[in-house]
């Protein structure tokens, strides 16, 4: 594959990532705008990944239509994505208007100065799902804020957990509460919330004080259509919304998920605690509710 288009794209991604990182370190750029189709957008992501959180980034793309996965365009950065509407082949009455809007947006972003913070507040990263929100909002967040910490929550949907890990690797947090680890179930058994293979390892590897719980680790998140497949007929189900259904894991699947936790946590060289909730792993895992399976 050395001479293939894909190999060339990978080489270009490596080069542009390194070059943009160098330009930013030299204070030669304050933002980034990219225009492209499928390959161009993938290359652009490598450039945007080289810039820190908060630096303006805009991708104008033919595949930003909702029909394609957005992970190729954004990944774990904070880029703004704009649909080009038409394919990109020179300037015409439509592309001119779209490009002008994109230029106006990036210029405006660069000109807006960040608000000056009165003092530096240490941040705690927390993974969260709809099925684990209540204890975070009612108990954990207020208690941490009372102690002077800023609380940053990440939706553990296959992207949010990875975003939290990325920021942990960059030293963004004073501590991490990995409260919603459903992505480990997905990494083993599929569904909508599959994350990177290294999920949950960044804070541990960087010796950031970490507390881990198996919040929602006993469910698999599926599309409503997939949840109705015959292989899931014997599973307990909870229709979370019109697009998403939660199903319970089996005893054997839970053993595999537990082994994944053990493998990752055993790498710890810093301060790590594992808390086991004795009365259920998520909001529907309670006696009398849809996913109760003691």
Regions found by a protein language model. Give the residues of each.
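C-terminal non-catalytic interaction/assembly regions of soluble proteins
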Residues: 191-294
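Glycine-rich phosphate/diphosphate-binding loop of Rossmann-like nucleotide-binding domains
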Residues: 1, 119-158, 166-170
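Phosphate/nucleotide-donor binding subsite
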Residues: 1-25
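Short Gly/Thr/Asp-enriched flexible loops that form oxyanion-binding sites at enzyme active sites
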Residues: 38-53, 137-141, 290
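Gly/Ser/Thr-rich loops at beta-strand to alpha-helix junctions
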Residues: 30, 34-43, 64-65, 126-136, ...
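Cap/lid and interdomain-hinge subdomains that line or gate substrate/regulatory clefts
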Residues: 2-4, 67-128, 256, 263
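Short, acidic/small-residue loops that bind anionic groups at enzyme active sites
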Residues: 31-34, 43-73, 81-83, 150-156, ...
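Acidic, glycine-rich loop-and-beta core segments that form the ion-binding/anion-interacting portion
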Residues: 145-198
């Amino acid at each position: 594959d050395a001479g293939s288009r894909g190999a060339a794209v990978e080489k270009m991604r490596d080069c542009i990532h390194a070059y943009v990182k160098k330009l930013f370190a030299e204070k030669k750029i304050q933002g980034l705008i990219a225009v492209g189709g499928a390959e161009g957008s993938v290359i652009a992501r490598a450039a945007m990944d080289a810039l820190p959180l908060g630096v303006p980034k805009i991708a104008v793309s033919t595949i930003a239509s909702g029909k394609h996965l957005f992970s190729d365009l954004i990944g774990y950065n904070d880029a703004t994505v704009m649909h080009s509407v038409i394919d990109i082949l020179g300037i015409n009455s439509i592309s001119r208007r779209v490009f002008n809007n994109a230029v106006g947006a990036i210029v405006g972003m660069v000109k807006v100065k960040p608000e000056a913070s009165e003092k530096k507040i240490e941040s705690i990263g927390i993974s969260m799902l709809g099925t684990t929100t209540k204890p975070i909002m009612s108990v954990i967040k207020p208690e941490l804020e009372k102690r002077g910490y800023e609380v940053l929550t990440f939706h553990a949907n296959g992207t949010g957990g990875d975003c939290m890990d990325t920021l942990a690797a960059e030293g963004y947090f004073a501590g991490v509460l990995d409260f919603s680890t459903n992505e480990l179930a997905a990494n083993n058994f599929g569904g909508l919330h599959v994350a990177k293979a290294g999920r949950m390892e960044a804070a541990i590897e960087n010796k950031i004080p970490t507390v881990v719980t198996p919040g929602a680790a006993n469910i698999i998140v599926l599309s409503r259509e997939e949840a109705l497949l015959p292989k899931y007929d014997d599973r307990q189900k909870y229709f979370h919304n019109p697009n998403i259904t939660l199903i319970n894991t089996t005893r054997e699947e839970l053993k595999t998920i537990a082994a994944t936790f053990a493998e990752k946590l055993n790498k710890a060289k810093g301060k790590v605690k594992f808390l086991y909730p004795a009365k259920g792993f998520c909001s529907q895992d309670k006696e009398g509710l849809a996913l109760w399976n003691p």
